[in-house]
Amino acid sequence: MQFVHMADNHLGYRQYNLDERENDIYESFLECIDKIIEIRPDFVIHSGDLFESPQPPVNAIRCAMEGLLKLKEKNIPIYLIHGNHDIPKSQQKGKPFGLLKKILGNSLLTFGKNKSHVFNNEVFIGGIEYVSQNKIPKTYEDLEKINSDSKNYKKKILLFHQSVNPFIPQSFEMQVTDFPDDFNYIAGGHIHQRALKPINDGNSVFSYAGSTDIMSVSEVKDYKKNGKGFYLGDLSGDFDINSIQKIDVECRNFLIDKKIKNENDYKKTVEELQNLQSEKKKPILYCDIVENLFNSFNDEIANLTLYKRISRIDENLEESLIINESSIEEIFQEYIKNKEMDVNFVYGLYKKLLENDEDSLLYVNDYFKGNY
């Protein structure tokens, strides 16, 4: 019996405010769906953040519907929890999964009041949706009930969407030891880097599936090391970390941390960009360059990248001035995302304050009522 674990598609996210990056994220999701159909697992579990926003754009909804309908046509059910990006900040607004459920019916199973489902009378699947730090005590109560309800099952999976220590030691909401110790697979979302860890003396596997595309430049190094995509698990026999394998998708190339201090560095970087032109998608470039080479380099690579962020290096001052194609708003949004803050709320408040919006306090009040 096989299952797929996926998370953090963030459909609708427009990195650098580019159509091409929004489409990349749709394509990565649909590539995952196509690979899942090739594998034909018994079911799919999804650990949240299907969408970038709780009010996703039409194209994001269309993409999600296209992919999930393909699974339905192959009789592959999907078990899905809400991540922080999927949950509306105002209680008056509906959740996007409602529309999906109306069309997909029982092939899409979510975890609201009902914290568990059972697949084929054999596999117990529990789910706890994302909550803010102040609501974690309620999550512990939910975990106790899930653990109690699962006692008569040998095969058990638990979905969650939180930051967990030691994977995020600087800013976490829960500990690995907070989770029931007799579940086979603890399936996480929220963290965009892949992670697999045997726990409970190797009898359980704790996992983050990671995102299905590069959502931030901070993810590039991990992508090159561990890839992006989903996990495939096998519950047929004795279950341990060897029962899990990575299934990868290909993302657009990012060239980062390039230092151009002389003509040789210049030539190598241009050649690397030229060699990537045979790929279907133009790369994204982050680099530092000395002042005297900046103008010629900027002109030469003008048509070789989708997006570039170049820092001029003043070797005397050992400082850099960033010259890029971003607006202040784009840089601000990326900074918020890198800090793992709530991009939708912080950026929404920022815009309201700029416009002297009288509803700013109501906006903040609705957010905190819904999250704390």
Swiss-Prot record:
EC number annotated for this UniProt entry: 3.1.-.-
Keyword presence, Metal-binding: yes
EC category: hydrolase
Segments forming a coiled coil: none
Keywords for the protein's UniProt record, in alphabetical order: DNA damage, DNA repair, Endonuclease, Exonuclease, Hydrolase, Manganese, Metal-binding, Nuclease
The protein's required cofactors: Mn(2+)
Pfam families: Metallophos (PF00149)
Recorded GO MF terms: 3'-5' exonuclease activity; DNA end binding; endonuclease activity; manganese ion binding; Y-form DNA binding
Domain of life, per lineage: Archaea
SUPFAM superfamilies per the UniProt record, alphabetical: Metallo-dependent phosphatases
Annotated Mn(2+) 2 binding sites: 49, 84, 161, 190
Residues annotated as catalytic: 85 (proton donor)
Reported regulation of activity: Nuclease activity is regulated by Rad50.
Binding site for Mn(2+) 1: 8, 10, 49, 192
Gene Ontology process terms (BP): double-strand break repair
Cofactor: binding comment: Binds 2 manganese ions per subunit.
Function: Part of the Rad50/Mre11 complex, which is involved in the early steps of DNA double-strand break (DSB) repair. The complex may facilitate opening of the processed DNA ends to aid in the recruitment of HerA and NurA. Mre11 binds to DSB ends and has both double-stranded 3'-5' exonuclease activity and single-stranded endonuclease activity.
Record-stated family: Belongs to the MRE11/RAD32 family.
Quaternary assembly: Homodimer. Forms a heterotetramer composed of two Mre11 subunits and two Rad50 subunits.
Protein name per UniProt: DNA double-strand break repair protein Mre11
Annotated organism of origin: Methanococcus maripaludis (strain DSM 14266 / JCM 13030 / NBRC 101832 / S2 / LL)
GN (gene name): mre11
